[in-house]
Amino acid sequence: MVKLKNIKKNHDLISCDFFPEDAQNPGHIEYNIANDEVINCDYPEGYEWCDSHLSHAVDYLSSVANDDKMPESKLIMWY
């Protein structure tokens, strides 16, 4: 599970805070829409192993990249 909060789109950049699993403090993602790549990712301390969580978050950001309106938050769950 990963929670995305403060999702913001500014031209070709989407940024958000992300909380993998039970993290109390957020990490931060910056995703470049034009290049389809993460240009910055800061994991929350102690959650540096959460590459899978980052991948799910980026997949979601990519899927909404061309939407006119961004949600402010999103909960992503998988099994």
What does each model-found stretch correspond to?
Residues 28-79:
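Acidic, low-complexity intrinsically disordered segments
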Residues 2-34:
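N-terminal acidic leader/helix
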